[in-house]
Amino acid sequence: MDITDQTIEYVSTLAKLSLQPEEKEKAKKDLGNILGYIDKMKELNTDGIEPMSHVLPMKNVFREDVVTNEENREELLKNAPKQMDGCFMVPKTVD
């Protein structure tokens, strides 16, 4: 696919890139190859093929959450770098 200098200028402006002349030539070639590949993909017959969000079949492998009503405040506070009056102390984040 043929890419013009104006197209490269437009795309580089959108991407906030400042390209040198040799970089523009390489970008023209690369963008042309990418668009050519996309055109080739458009020729594929995808009838009956179910869309997918991942290349590999994915499933959630995490454990189920289990709600418990435990009172282990002291045990939890052992993990706190700082504590005061039974509460976690954290650095101030807002002035």
From Swiss-Prot:
Q: Does the keyword Protein biosynthesis apply?
A: yes
Q: Which domain of life is it from?
A: Bacteria
What keyword terms does UniProt attach to this protein?
A: ATP-binding, Ligase, Nucleotide-binding, Protein biosynthesis
Which reactions does this protein catalyse?
L-glutamyl-tRNA(Gln) + L-glutamine + ATP + H2O = L-glutaminyl-tRNA(Gln) + L-glutamate + ADP + phosphate + H(+); L-aspartyl-tRNA(Asn) + L-glutamine + ATP + H2O = L-asparaginyl-tRNA(Asn) + L-glutamate + ADP + phosphate + 2 H(+)
Q: Which GO terms describe its molecular function?
A: asparaginyl-tRNA synthase (glutamine-hydrolyzing) activity; ATP binding; glutaminyl-tRNA synthase (glutamine-hydrolyzing) activity
- InterPro entries membership: Asp/Glu-ADT_sf_sub_c, GatC
Q: Does the keyword Protein biosynthesis apply?
A: yes
Q: Which GO terms describe its biological process?
A: glutaminyl-tRNAGln biosynthesis via transamidation; regulation of translational fidelity; translation
Documented EC number(s): 6.3.5.-
Query: What does the subunit section of this Swiss-Prot or TrEMBL entry state?
Result: Heterotrimer of A, B and C subunits.
Q: What does this protein do?
A: Allows the formation of correctly charged Asn-tRNA(Asn) or Gln-tRNA(Gln) through the transamidation of misacylated Asp-tRNA(Asn) or Glu-tRNA(Gln) in organisms which lack either or both of asparaginyl-tRNA or glutaminyl-tRNA synthetases. The reaction takes place in the presence of glutamine and ATP through an activated phospho-Asp-tRNA(Asn) or phospho-Glu-tRNA(Gln).
Q: What family does this belong to?
A: Belongs to the GatC family.
Q: Per its UniProt record, what HAMAP family does this chain match?
A: GatC (MF_00122)
Q: Please state what the protein is called.
A: Aspartyl/glutamyl-tRNA(Asn/Gln) amidotransferase subunit C
Q: Which organism is it from?
A: Lachnoclostridium phytofermentans (strain ATCC 700394 / DSM 18823 / ISDg)
The record lists the lineage as: Bacteria, Bacillati, Bacillota, Clostridia, Lachnospirales
